[in-house]
């Protein structure tokens, strides 16, 4: 499809202006996968299409549930048309199960501890500083978002978490945690933006960590081999297939 000027490029996607509508943008999903703030990087042929399919399924479900998102359409597996936003440089994380970086930062908390309600954390998007955690007060003090917006980020991110948690629970899969991002649309309203795919969460079938289906499998590899990358691709394919059910029910 026709593309406008390139606006930005990250490790897993490229964002272009829409050639005909200044209120829209086009996201192209790439085949890259990375970990450790980009210290580990590989290409998995077909991953972009699988990530795009998962993201389109998630955003379609959220739109149908009345969540404000930037998603408009996905005309091709690797292509997503979205409302153009100014991104807020935060990762908003909700945690149901203590695992991953949380237990490294809180060694007194046992892995598998359940948070009810989900635990909310904010992280500043800054690869050079390894995305440091940031408090709501610091977010306001640094002018990243207003106090009212921080409350909205908290409430909307929890709403998104609970919707996705319910969808996974219907397949006997535990959503351990979820990382999402927000932007401001042309009117200044907050919307869920960026992507939500198999890089965005930890999911454990039957609540069993050893059966994980997500990007953590790639992170955990002591050495990355071609067979290992194919294993990751198959997991992403399974997750894309499973999320198809969220929009076909």
From Swiss-Prot:
Q: Which reaction does it catalyse?
A: 5-amino-1-(5-phospho-D-ribosyl)imidazole-4-carboxylate + L-aspartate + ATP = (2S)-2-[5-amino-1-(5-phospho-beta-D-ribosyl)imidazole-4-carboxamido]succinate + ADP + phosphate + 2 H(+)
Top-level taxon of the source organism: Bacteria
The pathway noted for it is: Purine metabolism; IMP biosynthesis via de novo pathway; 5-amino-1-(5-phospho-D-ribosyl)imidazole-4-carboxamide from 5-amino-1-(5-phospho-D-ribosyl)imidazole-4-carboxylate: step 1/2
Annotated InterPro entries = SAICAR_synt/ADE2_N, SAICAR_synthetase, SAICAR_synthetase_CS
Q: Which GO terms describe its molecular function?
A: ATP binding; phosphoribosylaminoimidazolesuccinocarboxamide synthase activity
* EC number per UniProt: 6.3.2.6
Provide the top EC class: ligase
User: Keyword set for this entry?
Assistant: ATP-binding, Ligase, Nucleotide-binding, Purine biosynthesis
Q: Where is the signal peptide?
A: none
Q: Which Gene3D superfamilies match?
A: ATP-grasp fold, B domain (3.30.470.20), Phosphorylase Kinase, domain 1 (3.30.200.20)
Q: Tell me, what is an example of a GO biological process annotation in this record?
A: 'de novo' IMP biosynthetic process
Family, per the entry? Answer: Belongs to the SAICAR synthetase family.
UniProt-recorded name of the protein: Phosphoribosylaminoimidazole-succinocarboxamide synthase
**Gene of origin?**
purC
